[in-house]
Amino acid sequence: MLGVLLYCFNTEYYRYDKIAAKTVPLLKKNLGLPITIVTNFDTFKCMPPLGFINYKIVDNEKGNNIDNKPWHNLDRHRAYELSPYDQTILLDIDYFCYTDHLLTLAETDQDFMVHDKVHDVSGNDSYKFARSSMVPMVWATCIIFKKTERTKAIFDMVRYIKERYNYFCELYRINFRNFRNDYAFAIALHQLGGFKGYETIPTRLPTLPGGAKVTKVTDTGVSWVWQGRVGSIENCDVHVIDKGVQNV
């Protein structure tokens, strides 16, 4: 069975349950797949009615920060054990799914795929990280995996890297010192693949950078303003970084 797995943990600054209220209906509409949300009890109590959802209540690991704010991203390595599906589309909760493109990507013989390139939909070409580490970064925003021994080893390796992240930052000269799943998965794939290449999602991850402030969300697209310029995207999946989208 193919299904979608999401993580949703509120913080004192951001209400991810409000973002889920916008993205989950889009997933249901455009993918028509069963959905599992991994969350904690405090966030679960805030969740709006979303129809049939399989909830996994966990005590999420804490201690990571970004921009001096809590960043609850330390449990993604548990996706293999927490997913009830034979094949899983693992997504960030702020992935706005406006197409059925992910269904096509899931029609693969590969047991693990992740984006290694990103497309800045604002047109500002914001993502240039080639000099930020010695290992090419991947984007853990969207991962498609099957339950195999190989994929289990990948997620186990991510856990191992998380527990020793400072060491791996030194080893791979990673500038971003707060734990980041993008680098953890990149290192895991690099090492478990015998330092060779690995299969990736053959498209760029459409992303709206955090500098773009979302002004409107509809059933078909997102609008924003950035540096005095207005932009929008229609009928295309997009990963929205601006957490202010919770209030739009």
Tell where the protein language model's regions lie, with residue ranges.
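Glycosyltransferase catalytic domains, chiefly GT-A lineage
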Residues: 1-248
